[in-house]
Swiss-Prot record:
Organism: Trichophyton tonsurans
UniProt feature, compositional bias: Basic and acidic residues: 11-26
Region annotation Disordered: where it falls in the sequence: 1-26
Top-rank taxon: Eukaryota
Protein name: 83 kDa hypersensitivity protein
Keywords of this entry: Allergen
C-alpha cells in the first residue's frame, strides 16, 4: 500500500495492511 491508499481508503473500521506488514484499523 502507498500513502495514497491509506488516505483514500474508506475509514469504516476496516483493517488494511500497512507498509510494515502489520494491520492498521481505521
Amino acid at each position: 500500500f502507498t500513502p495514497e491508499d491509506f488516505i483514500s481508503a474508506p475509514r469504516r473500521g476496516e483493517a488494511i495492511p500497512d507498509p510494515k506488514g502489520e494491520l492498521a484499523v481505521f
